[in-house]
């Protein structure tokens, strides 16, 4: 429930005036309806490991989309909606990172490209640092141009990051927006869905897989949705 509350509070705090203090009083009129045992108020022994990184993103998207019906000129299109969690390692080493993507376009501006958005708090890992400490080589790290949705205001682009494994490893992916694209608003187009590719072959959004030395994993993160009809 704490993740659910944080995600809802985050959205509402973004809509409040800047001078509003960060305190319980600012949100005292908010009532959360999340019955015990439901998806957003899970009880032990339910698995909740990805709640803070993926479920929180879904909650933010749902609340923003609902508010867009009543605040159409204040709500942005959907951002990438995932943290693109990548974990890898073996008995001798382990590494975990999250990958940025596109932000949704706002009613008056383009979305930002290749950045984390909403419920996130992680920094970019330089390729040089990763390669210096682990048997992994970064063969591509670039903006995924054209992945943001078209519109009067364009969604931000995602990014591409490719890992070449120099030793056998186990890889776990916890990602979203591989089936349903980040939505556009007010006639704007959806952003591109994310993709996970191992040696060019698609992988599902969530998987644990064994890889061998020489194999390559390419992550293409989602673009943000566009806002408004293009050309108007």
What are these model-derived regions, one by one?
Residues 1-232:
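Glycine/proline-enriched, intrinsically flexible loops and inter-domain linkers
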């Amino acid at each position: 429930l704490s993740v659910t509350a944080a995600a809802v509070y985050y959205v509402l705090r973004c809509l409040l005036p800047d001078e509003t203090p960060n305190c319980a009083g600012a949100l005292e009129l908010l009532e959360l309806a999340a019955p015990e045992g439901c998806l957003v108020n899970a009880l032990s022994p339910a698995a909740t490991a990805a709640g803070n990184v993926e479920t929180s993103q879904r909650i933010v998207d749902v609340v923003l989309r609902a508010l867009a019906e009543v605040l159409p000129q204040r709500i942005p299109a959907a951002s990438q909606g995932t943290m693109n969690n990548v974990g890898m390692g073996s008995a001798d080493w382990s590494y975990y990172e999250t990958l940025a993507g596109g932000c949704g376009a706002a009613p008056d501006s383009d979305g930002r490209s290749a950045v984390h958005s909403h419920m996130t708090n992680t920094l970019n890992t330089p390729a040089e640092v990763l390669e210096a400490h682990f048997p992994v080589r970064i063969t591509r790290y670039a903006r995924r141009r054209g992945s943001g949705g078209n519109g009067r205001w364009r969604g931000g682009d995602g990014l591409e990051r490719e890992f070449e494994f120099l030793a056998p490893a186990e890889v776990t992916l916890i990602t979203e927006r591989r089936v349903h694209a980040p939505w556009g608003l007010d006639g704007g187009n959806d952003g591109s869905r994310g993709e996970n590719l191992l040696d060019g072959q698609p992988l599902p959004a969530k998987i644990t897989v064994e890889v061998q030395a020489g194999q390559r994993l390419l992550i293409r993160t989602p673009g943000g949705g566009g806002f408004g009809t293009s050309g108007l």
